[in-house]
Amino acid sequence: VDAPIFVIPLWADLTAVGLGGIQGALFASGFRGQRRLDLLGVAIIGIVMGMGGGIIRDMLLNQPLSTLQSNWYLLTATLAALVGMLLAGPLRRLNGLIVGLDAVVIGLFGAFGTSKALALGLPLVPAVFVGVCAAVGGGILRDVFMGLPVAIMHVGSLYAVAAAAGCLVLGVSNLFGVPLVAAAVAGVIVTAVIRVLAVVFDLSLPEQRMLYRRKVAAETGTLPIVKP
């Protein structure tokens, strides 16, 4: 008899999809590029943000796409994107709320990805990898769709690092016998806290060329000038 397929509770998955949809629409509504997005464009970005993480997660795990197994996923993502568009003006003035929303979305998708990978029998390291990909996948697709540089590839407040820390906490906790649900909650909290602190205190990984400068300075006693 085949082992039962691990299923994330529908309400939990839809919560992540909805929050991601709102966050994507808020981002797209505030976009000020050479070509402004119309209502359809903003809605598409919201849907991509809401559903992207789950799609990437299930593709990596070679599982049926959860987002295509129910009408509720697309409906939730679309409705959330519309809410994000309608409330874009008031919510953009609440920067702390947007940062918190972003942190929770990353944490949820990371926790769901890692939990599902562990439940399907993946070892710790691959499970954490799946979780991180699920956490940042929506943001990557958003940037690709909007023709922007992929944010996680550039210097900025900790994003993938926060997701990795939360996913690792989840995986290690479960390894030591903590129930998967409790471990997932801990993972979401860790991811959200690190992400918020990174934004508040402007924390980021060092730039590669800064490491080069320090190495040369240590070896020669001089500070090289590196042109951008």
Regions found by a protein language model. Give the residues of each.
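Helix-coil boundary and interhelical linker segments in multi-pass alpha-helical membrane proteins
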Residues: 1-10, 59-68, 113-126, 171-183
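N-terminal topogenic module of multi-pass integral membrane proteins
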Residues: 1-51, 55-61
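Intrinsically disordered, low-complexity non-transmembrane regions of multi-pass membrane transporters
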Residues: 1-7, 203-228
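Structural signature of hydrophobic alpha-helical transmembrane segments
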Residues: 6-18, 65-79, 123-136
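Loop-to-transmembrane alpha-helix initiation sites
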Residues: 13-14, 70-74, 123-129, 155-163, ...
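C-terminal ends of transmembrane helices
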Residues: 22-35, 57-59, 82-95, 140-151, ...
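Cytoplasmic-side transmembrane-helix entry/capping segments in multi-pass membrane proteins
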Residues: 37-46, 69-75, 95-106, 130, ...
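Small-residue-rich segments of transmembrane alpha-helices in multi-pass membrane proteins
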Residues: 45-52, 77, 102-115, 133, ...
